Amino acid sequence: MSALLVIFALVLMITIFNTQSAYEEKEAAINEKNQMIEEVVGVKSEIIQELIKAFKDSDLAMEVDPQTGAIRFSGGVFFESNSSEVSPTGREYLEEFIPQYINILLSDRFRDEISQIIVEGHTDTAGGYLYNLQLSQDRALSVVQQIFQPTFPNFKYRGDLKSVITANGRSFSIPILKADGSIDANKSRRVEFKFRLKDDQLLDQLQGLGEKDGN
């Protein structure tokens, strides 16, 4: 009987030890994941704060999203209705905006963190989806082309920008809504400048794992 008790006690101790070890390993993995999330979120937050500070007193008709860092210009600033040619006013806006914007994103402080700088065109819901998809794509591309025109004033990091900038058209897939839930056609016609971090995909995966851990 005493031998059985000894065996039982040993098995119980091993089980408790293994359970404790597994718990500690899981706890360490969760802590490591949370630290990585904090680091990525911290970098993004720093960039957003720098953008807000740089443009808070700007006369440009633009908005900085405090959550994502996306910078939104009304479409009327750059383009006439149904046109993808950058207007003279739009060029003036770009000449003032781009050097400041790129000087932040591609500075020594943040350059290694940036995966993409995205110029994104959006339209209102007038007309068909495909027509507006083409129009929004053409507008985004026109903005990028304008930035690299030989007549556009030179700015710091212009050469580096070529490797990370992209132009996307979204048609009317992401409209801006009024308080009553209806579409604000004027605000929906817009151009947005966004940035994506190299660790954004990792952040999405880590946050997804966090949701699973919480279930």
Task: Mark where each language-model region is.
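Surface-exposed acidic, glycine-flexible loop patches that form ligand/cofactor-binding
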Residues: 61-62, 106-111, 156-158, 182-183
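Second-shell loop/turn segments in exported
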Residues: 33-40, 77-89, 128-134
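Short N-terminal helix-initiation segments at or just after the protein's N-terminus
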Residues: 58-71, 114, 135-140, 199-201
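Short terminal targeting/anchoring segments
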Residues: 1-42
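Periplasmic peptidoglycan-binding/anchoring modules of Gram-negative envelope and division proteins
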Residues: 51, 64, 79, 83-118, ...
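Periplasmic OmpA-like peptidoglycan-binding domain that tethers envelope proteins to the cell wall
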Residues: 88, 120-203, 209
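Soluble periplasmic/extracytoplasmic beta-strand elements of cell-envelope proteins
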Residues: 61-63, 70-78, 116-120, 166-168, ...
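Charged/polar helix/coil "stalk" or linker segments at domain boundaries
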Residues: 31, 42-77, 91-93
